[in-house]
Amino acid sequence: MHGWRRARLTERTKQTATGRTLTFEVPHWPGHLPGQHVDVRLTADDGYQAVRSYSLAAPADAGGDRIELGVQAAFGGEVSPYLADDLPVGAEVEVMGPLGGWFVWTPQDHGPLLLIAGGSGVVPVMAMLRARAASASGDPCTLLYSVRAPDEVWYATELDAATEGVRVRLLYTRTAPEGSRRPAGRITTDDLLGMPPPTDTRCYVCGPTAFVEHVGELLLAAGYGPDRIRTERFG
C-alpha cells in the first residue's frame, strides 16, 4: 500500500435517493480485491482535512486506473453529502488504499457463497458478485439483501439480471412491495432456511453494526462456524 493518491471524479450514478456510485480515475492504481475499501481525504481551502472510509463496489480493472465507490449520504454528515451530490465531476480528492484484508473474496475461494447485506452494506458485496460473474465460477451463490423499502435497493437493475448460479432474495424491513409473500420485518432464522449448508459455505455479512451482530448470531445458531463467517460493519 502506498500513501495518498490523487483521484479525479469521472462519473456519478444515482442508486437510491441518498445513495450514489462514484467512479474515480486514480493514476497508477495498484489494484484491489473484492471486499476491500479506501480512505478518502478532502482538504478545504483553509487547510482543514476530513477522512472517511468507503467500500469499493467493483473488482479491479486489469491494469486499469478506475475505481468505483459507494457513498451513502448521511443526514447531517460532514463528508458523505458533499461527495454524493456536490463534488463536481472532474474535481479531485485523495484516496489511500486498498485497505482491508479480512473481508475479501476471490474466485480462488471455492465453495458455496452466502452474502448477506443491509442497506449500503451491499457495496463491497457487489464487488464480490461482479468478480464471481467475471470468473464464470460454478459455485452456487446466494445474496440476502435487507432494505427498508423497495426504493432503497442499490444496483436494482443489475440484481434483477443476476447471472446463472446466483440467487438474490430481497428482504424488506419496513415496507414490502404489494404481493410479497414475506411480511416486512428484520431478518430471521426462517430467512436462512434453504440457504447453502453450513459445512463448506463462506459467509460474508456487511451492514450497520446492529444488523451485522444480529445476522452473526443467526448464522451461528444455524450451525455456520465462526471460521466461515466474515463481517464488515459501519455506523
Regions found by a protein language model. Give the residues of each.
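A short, basic/flexible loop-to-alpha-helix module at the beginning of a structural domain
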Residues: 97-109
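Conserved beta-strand elements of the Class I
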Residues: 114-115, 204
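Ferredoxin-reductase
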Residues: 1-91, 147-149, 172-175
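Histidine-anchored nucleotide/phosphate-binding helix
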Residues: 124-134
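Reductase modules of NAD(P)H-dependent flavoproteins
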Residues: 2-6, 140-235
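Short, conserved phosphate/pyrophosphate- and ester-handling motifs at nucleotide-, phospho-/glycolipid
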Residues: 35, 121, 208
